[in-house]
Amino acid sequence: MPSRKKHLAGIIPLANLEDKLGFPYHPSLTPVYGGYLAVEAAVHEAAWAGCNTIWIVCNDDVQPLVRHRVGEYTYDPAFMDRSKWDRFPSQSRKTIPIYYTGLLSKDIGKRDCYAYSIIHGAQMAIDVSRAVSHWADPDKFYVSFPMGVYNPKALGYYRKEINKPGKAFGWRYEGKTVKDGEHLGFAFTHENLKDFRKRIMEGTGTYSRETLANGFQKKLPSEERNSGRHFSLDKVFQDVIFNEQEGFLRDISWYHKIDNWTGYRDYLASEHWYILRHPGKIYTKYREFNQIGVDDIDNSEE
């Protein structure tokens, strides 16, 4: 029986990202370098991690602008150095398709915390891939946060660990990970996804478990209903294990959380903005897949 190729699905959560910066646009569109946005840096990070597909979770209000900026696919940077020596480099590049999905209306206002955007993105990657073929089912998922800034090239050294089936992977900075609420990338498995869903379902609904004398359930006060929509990253992802038996945990040399003005200002004042400089138009140029039967006219070699 032929072996199935591994499928690492990249998840970039934009929906329900709290806006602490106060800019007149979505926080994911914040520049991290001249002409280089946070969401583009997140896509490039997912590409360095070795993702085969990238799923951007964003609602209809911001999706058109993000899609216009990011496009429908990017290239795997690990293959770029190899392809430049080929006679036709564009034919040797590895393409990574980018998909866009919004939250379901039944989840909005009930469990739509920022962490749930990650869960929803992973579930959509499973549902859509399985609809195509069971051979396309994702093995693992890698989360790339747009508001967590660090050197994406570091991921290239740990591709095998990130893609290893059945084991989680996480980045750590000064002893903290996503389990502490930091926007540090991590990879998780199907079993981890089940645990995340259970944690979200621990949130309250509209009614309490208390039954009244007339047999009806008691309604909770409005401030206590649907508590899952307020769950933080550390609460939802506290059960993921990063140890040598069940996962990997690796340290990074620098990291900035730019979801607030203080963190964003510190990042701009550091020398790290230059390390995270624009990777080149070859990765960020807007591209669309051609329709069936239409020749590929994108022959750019920039």
What residue spans do the PLM features occupy?
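Cofactor-binding loop segments of dinucleotide-utilizing enzymes, especially the Rossmann-like FAD-
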Residues: 13-15, 59, 146
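Short, charged/polar "capping" segments at the starts of alpha-helices
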Residues: 20, 62-68
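Residues in the short beta-alpha loop(s) of Rossmann-like NAD(P)-binding domains
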Residues: 35, 58-62
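Short internal beta-strands
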Residues: 54-59, 171
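N-terminal nucleotide-binding beta1-loop-alpha1 segment
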Residues: 1-30, 36, 41, 45-54, ...
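Short, aromatic/basic amphipathic alpha-helical patches
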Residues: 66-78
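Conserved beta-loop-beta/alpha segment of the NTase-like Rossmann-fold superfamily
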Residues: 76, 85-202
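Catalytic-core segments of class I nucleotidyltransferases/pyrophosphorylases
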Residues: 134, 150-163, 175-301
